[in-house]
Amino acid sequence: MLKAQVFMFVTVLVFVCVFINSNDAKRYIEYPPWQKHPCNPRFPTPDCYKRTPANPYRRGCTCISRCRRDCGGLSTWKKLLDTILKIPV
């Protein structure tokens, strides 16, 4: 009778340990998501990369050169301060 109880205890203990380990393994081990990213890193194809235009648009004039547009430079700040600090004479 004692041997049967020990055998049942050990069997249940092994079963519980295997069950706990299998749940932890499913929770923490993640295999590569083949559906999310179909490209194989070992054999990349041109479809795997993001396409960029050959000649991206760039405006020829920058704020620092102050040509053809107002970038909110010194003149804009000066106008704002003049309107705020307008002192009646």
UniProtKB/Swiss-Prot annotation:
Tell me the leader sequence span. 1-25
Keyword check for Calcium: no
What is the predominant subcellular site recorded for this chain?
secreted
Disulfide bridge map: C39-C48, C61-C67
- GO molecular function annotation: hormone activity
Kindly state one GO CC term assigned in the UniProt record: apoplast
Which taxonomic lineage is given here? Eukaryota, Viridiplantae, Streptophyta, Embryophyta, Tracheophyta
Q: Which organism is it from?
A: Arabidopsis thaliana
Swiss-Prot/TrEMBL keywords: Disulfide bond, Hormone, Secreted, Signal
Task: Tell me which family the UniProt entry assigns to this protein.
Answer: Belongs to the plant rapid alkalinization factor (RALF) family.
| Domain of life, source organism | Eukaryota
Q: Where in the cell is it found?
A: Secreted
This chain belongs to which protein, by name?
A: Protein RALF-like 5
